[in-house]
């Protein structure tokens, strides 16, 4: 696949136009070659801009790039949940993947709980692939790539980034490095917890109302950060009406990057910019104008938000 082919595909995808099934297959083959070399805990250099859930809200991703700068000018780290719920999961994921193949050192993609065959069959990506391509091949190519995505990232050895949260099975980063990630997201265990867990104002660990992962308290965060010489955990996975939420004496932050989530929640979104000294700047943005006339998605039980 030549650079000019890739550049044409990126331009098409930026216009929210689909590339062919054959092009998707070739793109995924190339992406796999790049992702297989990345670590379970991928090292990322600052400056970098961290983005939370996107959920197929393509025009809001375009808004994000307006606010944060284009790739490769800006170095990006996306914390997963690229697909499901929004109307343009296909274009969203394929654009991010094409940028990854074109600029592998300027964009890092880690896996969220929605980067899963099972979840995408329920929440929209599967149906969207079938509707737009008339077969399940594109869904298969993409979900195969999900298995190669890193589970976490660490910025300058100081900021730990993950989609969901911590796990009682994980004490150190080496515990994450020991996971065989090339599989469907399991229903329980360390890999599952990284993608499903949530922080809460509790002590220790508690069962999660989501039915997967755990709730974990500030003492757990304190302990993990101390053991691993980490200053901050940065995660996504939970809708935050104000775009981001800092917890536990600034030891953890949730970043949410899907404005007016599901085209009905009325929330703003944010991205977190870190300069070379790891100084933080949150940038808030609202839903793109293109979404204004969209019909609201049917209500989702709050349990799953």
Curated annotation (Swiss-Prot):
Keyword S-adenosyl-L-methionine: no
Its EC number(s): 3.1.3.16
Annotated keywords: Hydrolase, Manganese, Metal-binding, Protein phosphatase
Biological process according to GO: double-strand break repair via homologous recombination
Source organism superkingdom: Eukaryota
Cofactor annotation: Mn(2+)
Enzyme class: hydrolase
Cofactor note: Binds 2 manganese ions per subunit.
Classification via SMART domains: PP2Ac (SM00156)
Cellular component annotations (GO), alphabetically ordered: cytoplasm; nucleus
Pfam family, one: Metallophos
Keyword match Metal-binding: yes
Active site annotation, chain numbering: 114
GO molecular function (one): protein serine/threonine phosphatase activity
Residues that hold Mn(2+) 1 according to the record: 53, 55, 81
Reactions performed catalytically: O-phospho-L-seryl-[protein] + H2O = L-seryl-[protein] + phosphate; O-phospho-L-threonyl-[protein] + H2O = L-threonyl-[protein] + phosphate
Residues the entry annotates as binding Mn(2+) 2: 81, 113, 163, 237
Matching InterPro entries: Calcineurin-like_PHP_ApaH, Metallo-depent_PP-like, PPA2-like, Ser/Thr-sp_prot-phosphatase
Similarity-based family: Belongs to the PPP phosphatase family. PP-4 (PP-X) subfamily.
Official protein name in the record: Serine/threonine-protein phosphatase PP-X homolog 3
Native species: Paramecium tetraurelia
Gene: Ppx3
């Amino acid at each position: 696949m030549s650079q000019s082919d890739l550049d044409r595909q990126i331009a098409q995808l930026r216009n929210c136009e689909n590339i062919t099934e054959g092009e998707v297959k070739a793109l995924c083959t190339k992406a796999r070659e790049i992702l297989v070399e990345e670590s379970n805990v991928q090292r990322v250099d600052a400056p970098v801009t961290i983005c939370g859930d996107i959920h197929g809200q393509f025009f809001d991703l375009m808004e994000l790039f307006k606010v944060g700068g284009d790739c490769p000018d800006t170095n990006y780290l996306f914390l997963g949940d690229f697909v499901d719920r929004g109307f343009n999961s296909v274009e969203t994921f394929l654009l991010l993947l094409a940028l990854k193949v074109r600029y592998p050192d300027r964009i890092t993609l880690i896996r969220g709980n929605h980067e899963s065959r099972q979840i995408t069959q329920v929440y929209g990506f599967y149906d969207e692939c079938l509707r737009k391509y008339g077969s399940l091949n594109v869904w298969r190519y993409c979900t195969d790539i999900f298995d190669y995505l890193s589970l976490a990232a660490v910025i300058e050895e100081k900021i730990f980034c993950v989609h969901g949260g911590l796990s009682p099975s994980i004490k150190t980063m080496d515990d994450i490095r020991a996971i065989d990630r090339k599989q469907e997201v399991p229903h329980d265990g360390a890999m599952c917890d990284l993608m499903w867990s949530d922080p809460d104002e509790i002590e220790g660990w508690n069962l999660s109302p989501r039915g997967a992962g755990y709730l974990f308290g500030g003492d757990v965060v304190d302990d993990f950060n101390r053991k691993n010489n980490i200053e901050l955990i940065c995660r996504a996975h939970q809708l935050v009406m104000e775009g981001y939420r800092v917890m536990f004496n600034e030891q953890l932050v949730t970043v949410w990057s899907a404005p007016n989530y599901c085209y009905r929640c009325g929330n703003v979104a944010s991205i977190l910019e870190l300069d070379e000294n790891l100084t933080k700047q949150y940038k808030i943005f609202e839903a793109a104008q293109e979404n204004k006339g969209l019909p609201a998605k049917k209500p989702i039980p709050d349990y799953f938000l």
